[in-house]
Structure formats: structure tokens, C-alpha cells
Amino acid sequence: MEYNKLVRDRIPEIIAEDNREPKTRILGEEEYVTELERKLREECEEVIAAGDGDSAEHRLEELGDVLEVMLALAKIDHFGLDDIAFAAEQKRKKRGGFDKRIYLIED
């Protein structure tokens, strides 16, 4: 089976445990960022799809995947979860969150 995509670190090991031989390569920095961005889009689409009648646990699992990719992207710039949370809080203080469910029609 052909994949041609960034996978989690243990995936080749898991494939090998199934008596298959994974063919892999290590990405360079620029390609790694590109593939992380592609993976983020993929995982966000899966979060949306999980909202279509799937269980709350499935959506939570998909949100966890999004967070994992976000953390990998943040790590490239030497940021971590605390930094992401701080940036989100600063934005929330300036512009608010989404708690009030406000839908802007026009200005």
C-alpha cells in the first residue's frame, strides 16, 4: 500500500509488527514543515467529519490529533503547549472567544 505522507513516529514499527516492510525516509526541515501543514489540514477535516453524528469521544480523539500536529509545528519555532495557550489567552483578552456564539452578518 502506498501512503506518501507524514506519519506518527511509531507507525513504521507498528507496520513491521504486522510482518510488512515499511519504506520510509526522513524529511528535511522545509519539507517537514510543508507536510505538517498538510497533516494539520487533514486532521482538521477529520475533526469536522467527526462532528457529523460520530461520538463525542471520536471528536475528542481527532482534536487530540490536531493538537499533536500543532505541537510539532510549534516545536519548530521553540514553542510549547504553554506558549500556545498563552497566545490564545492574549487573543481572547483582545478579541474575545466564541462562547457567545455571535454570528456576524454585516458591518
Where in the sequence are the language-model features?
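Flexible "arm" and connector segments at domain edges
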Residues: 1-107
